[in-house]
C-alpha cells in the first residue's frame, strides 16, 4: 500500500533544509498555480500524469525503464519525485527526460531531475542549446523577461521526427516552433490490452511575447507558429496532454478522471483540433491588437 500523496509530500519536505540549500532547486518566482500540488494519476495504459496543478508532466512506463516528459520548475522537483514514487515507480529508473520547451516553467527542474535519475535530457537542437546555457534563446519572443534557470550541460539536441525508443515504446519528436524557437511536441501509442490510442503531448502554442517583441514585426515567427498549429491539428490524436493543462481543458479532465468519470474524459479525438483552433484564435487576436 502506498502513502496518500499529501502524506508522501509531508515526509519528503520534512528535511526541507536540504532542498533549500540545493542550487538546482532554488525557487524561481512564477504563477502560484504552477506550484499547486496535484495527485498523480493514470491517464491510459502505461501513461501517467505526474505534473502540478498548472504544468503538465507525463511518465511513461516502457517495460524497460521510464520516460519523463518535461520537468516543471526547480522548486517542484520534490513534488515530481513524490508523484513518481506514489505511483510505485523509482526516480532512478528514468532513462530519458524529454522537453517541450526551454522555458523555466517546463524545464527549470530538468537539471535536478537529471542528476537524481541519471537520465539523458533530449529536445530539439535549438532547445538543447538554451538548456545548456541556462537561458532562453535570444530569438525567443519572451527572451527579455525570462529568468535564468539551472543549466543542463549534457542536454542532447535531436532532429525533427527523431524516435526515442525504450522497451516497447517509441516516442516521436514533432517540432512545433513559434512559442519558442525550439519547441517540440511528442507523440506515442499507449495501450490497454489490444486497445491502443495515439497520445500527443503538445507544446505550448500561445502567441505570448514580452518587451518590444511584436509578431507583426517578425513574420517568420508568425509563420512558424501558424505551421506548428496546423501540424498539431493534423496529428493522429486520441488523447491530448497540453503543456499547461488548462489550455486544453486538461484541468477539468484530470478532476473528472480522479472522480472516477467514465468513459475516460481524456479520450477525445477532437482534442488536438480544439487545441489548435484555440491557439489560432489567440494568435489572430494578438496580431489584431498589434496592428491596431
Where would I find each of the regions flagged by the language model?
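Sec-dependent signal peptide recognition
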Residues: 1-8
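Accessory terminal helices/loops
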Residues: 16-33, 193, 207-292
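Metallo-beta-lactamase
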Residues: 20-29, 36-38, 42-44, 93, ...
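Conserved beta-strand hairpin/beta-sheet module of binuclear metal-dependent hydrolase folds
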Residues: 33-87, 91, 186-207
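Loop/turn elements at helix/coil->beta-strand transitions in domains of secreted/extracellular proteins
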Residues: 65, 92-95, 117-120, 169-171, ...
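Active-site neighborhood of phospho(di)ester-bond hydrolases with catalytic His/Asp-centered motifs
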Residues: 69-71, 94-103, 122-124, 176-178, ...
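Active-site HxH/HxHxD metal-binding segment of metal-dependent hydrolases
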Residues: 75-78, 85-163, 191, 267-268
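Active-site environment of divalent metal-dependent phosphoester hydrolases
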Residues: 76, 102-108, 128-131, 181-184, ...
Amino acid at each position: 500500500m502506498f502513502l496518500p500523496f499529501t502524506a508522501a509530500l509531508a515526509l519528503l519536505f520534512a528535511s526541507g533544509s536540504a532542498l533549500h540549500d540545493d542550487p538546482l532547486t532554488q525557487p524561481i518566482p512564477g504563477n502560484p498555480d504552477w506550484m499547486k500540488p496535484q495527485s498523480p494519476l493514470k491517464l491510459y495504459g502505461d501513461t501517467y500524469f505526474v505534473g502540478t496543478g498548472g504544468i503538465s508532466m507525463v511518465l511513461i512506463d516502457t517495460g524497460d525503464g521510464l520516460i519523463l516528459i518535461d520537468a516543471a520548475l526547480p522548486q517542484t522537483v520534490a513534488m515530481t519525485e513524490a508523484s513518481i514514487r506514489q505511483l510505485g515507480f523509482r526516480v532512478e529508473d528514468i532513462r530519458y527526460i524529454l522537453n517541450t520547451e526551454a522555458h523555466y516553467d517546463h524545464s527549470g527542474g530538468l537539471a535536478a531531475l537529471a542528476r537524481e535519475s541519471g537520465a539523458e535530457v533530449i529536445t530539439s537542437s535549438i532547445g538543447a542549446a538554451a538548456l545548456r546555457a541556462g537561458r532562453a534563446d535570444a530569438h525567443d519572443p519572451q527572451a527579455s523577461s525570462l529568468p535564468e534557470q539551472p543549466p543542463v550541460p549534457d542536454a542532447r539536441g535531436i532532429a525533427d521526427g527523431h524516435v526515442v525508443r525504450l522497451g516497447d515504446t517509441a516516442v516521436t519528436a514533432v517540432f512545433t516552433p513559434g512559442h519558442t524557437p525550439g519547441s517540440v511536441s511528442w507523440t506515442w501509442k499507449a495501450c490497454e490490452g489490444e486497445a491502443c490510442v495515439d497520445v500527443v503531448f503538445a507544446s505550448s502554442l500561445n502567441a505570448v511575447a514580452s518587451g518590444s517583441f511584436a509578431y507583426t514585426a517578425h513574420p517568420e515567427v508568425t509563420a512558424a507558429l501558424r505551421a506548428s498549429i496546423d501540424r498539431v491539428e493534423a496529428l493522429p490524436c486520441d488523447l491530448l496532454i497540453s503543456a499547461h493543462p488548462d489550455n486544453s481543458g486538461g484541468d477539468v479532465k484530470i478532476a473528472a478522471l480522479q472522480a472516477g468519470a467514465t468513459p475516460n474524459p481524456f479520450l477525445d479525438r477532437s482534442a488536438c483540433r480544439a487545441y489548435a483552433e484555440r491557439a489560432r484564435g489567440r494568435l489572430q487576436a494578438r496580431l489584431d491588437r498589434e496592428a491596431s
